[in-house]
């Protein structure tokens, strides 16, 4: 139970911190475990997704373009992310490293 509790509280703090670092505009790359690629309209390129590129819990979803650009390599998930770094939902194939 102790381990589960610490994981839960860690997930909660990541979720709450995501909104404070949500949008950096174009040209920003946070590496493979990016937790705030495209939150809000048009940040990081021309995407209009909300929450794309996943976070450390691998559960982010995107509604529309994620992380801008067309034909990138980091946004191939379909709603549930992939493993520890999750890659977000359906975006427009944008790359996290705009």
Swiss-Prot record:
Domain of life: Eukaryota
Listed GO biological process terms: sorocarp development
Region entry Disordered, spans: 1-26, 60-98
InterPro entries the UniProt entry points to: HssA/B-related (IPR008455)
Residue ranges with Gly residues bias: 60-72, 89-98
One Pfam family hit: Coiled
Biased composition (Basic residues): 73-88
Family: Belongs to the hssA/B family.
UniProt-recorded name of the protein: HssA/B-like protein 34
Organism phylogeny: Eukaryota, Amoebozoa, Evosea, Eumycetozoa, Dictyostelia
């Amino acid at each position: 139970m102790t381990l589960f509790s610490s994981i839960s509280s860690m997930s909660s703090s990541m979720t709450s911190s995501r909104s404070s670092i949500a949008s950096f505009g174009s040209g920003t790359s946070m590496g493979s475990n990016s937790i705030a690629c495209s939150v809000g309209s048009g940040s990081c390129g021309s995407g209009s997704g909300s929450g794309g590129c996943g976070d450390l819990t691998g559960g982010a979803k995107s509604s529309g373009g994620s992380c801008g650009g067309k034909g990138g390599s980091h946004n191939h998930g379909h709603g549930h992310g992939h493993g520890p770094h999750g890659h977000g939902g359906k975006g427009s194939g944008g790359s996290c490293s705009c």
